[in-house]
Amino acid sequence: MRRTVFNEDHEAFRETLRAFIEAEVVPVYDEWFAAGQAPRDFYHKLGELGIFGINVPEEFGGAGLDTHKFEAVLYEETARAGVQFGGSGVHVLLALPYIKMLATDEQKKRYLPKFVTGEEMWALAMTEPGTGSDLAGMKTTAKLSEDGTHYVLNGAKTFITGGVHADRVIVAARTSAPTAEDRRFGISLFAVDTKSEGYSIGRKLDKLGLKTSDTAELAFVDVKVPAEDLLGEENKGFYYLGHNLASERWGIAFGAYAQAKAAVRFAKSYVQERTVFGKPVASFQNTKFELAACQAEVDAAEAVADRALEALDAGELTPAEAASAKLFCTEVAHRVIDRCLQLHGGYGFMNEYPIARLYADNRVNRIYGGTSEIMKTIIAKDMGL
């Protein structure tokens, strides 16, 4: 089937991005992998390339585009090369939508120019120890001072992608107690400066995959957050978080599809080169059947991911549709990558092969942004069940 989601501008960006990855990332990726994070100055290079400013208004230094298609190209190209851009994904996919939706003009003038250049990297802190998917159960608090000039932030967050390098973190905290009718009431969002006194980074977490993405625990002890860094209105944070989940889940879905596509590419190349019993692994009927089945699943996932992308750009992607896309694409990726690793035999278990890293990187897709079980719950509710 002919693919129609991308135009000449997107393909030109793809060529530029592919050349950048080959020159700036592939030669040093093993060093990043061993270090457990990309170096901080790499994000300045992404800023210079224009990655961070695609969807930022021109008045703040961006390109002023209103599309996720360039992000989609980035997902495909990083997966194709078997690399990750550190924790930069959360900067654009997670943090930027909240800034664009909630920040005042004054806040945008302060935040966005440095966002675009990579001078200030952003992260998002929702998850807490012991809460997981139950965001309404968060314990972190932010109390307004008597003079109304600042909030006092106390609490802890965990699994924060980009938490080591972040210069600002959007922190979800309780500003009021939940009501009897709605336990989701009372949560607010703050753009917290990580240089603030009382803000500390705990452990840099050692993950199964996504090794170049810094992930950390955060702690807040009487952190003074200026009132002008409140994003949106008090007590409406849960609504804001829910509003942007569709775009986040699309990003995970599209990234998972791209990983599955890359896995087939890696496996095809390997079985054509690898010889056993005197002939290429690709010549065996089982190999052909396995890769054919994987390709069919990738084709289906591509159609779902592309359709969700078009709906997202049109402002029409519903929560249930986003959940469906995430569930389908991540489950396809799980099956396809596992089968492609199997075709590598013992070499597929070695981290020097991209399929092994891809296997580990992919596993979290069925967990973060809402587990597969949560996605099924959302879909079932939409069905009236």
Language model: regions and residue ranges:
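A short core secondary-structure module
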Residues: 149-201
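Flexible, small-/acidic-enriched active-site or ligand-binding loops
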Residues: 137-139, 195-226
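Long, acidic (Asp/Glu-rich), low-complexity accessory segments flanking structured domains
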Residues: 218-240
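Glycine-rich phosphate/pyrophosphate-binding beta-alpha loops
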Residues: 131-132, 158-163, 210, 247-251, ...
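Alpha-helical interface subdomain recognition
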Residues: 1-81, 85, 102-107, 114-119, ...
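A short, Trp-centered hydrophobic/proline-enriched beta-strand micro-motif
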Residues: 118-126, 172
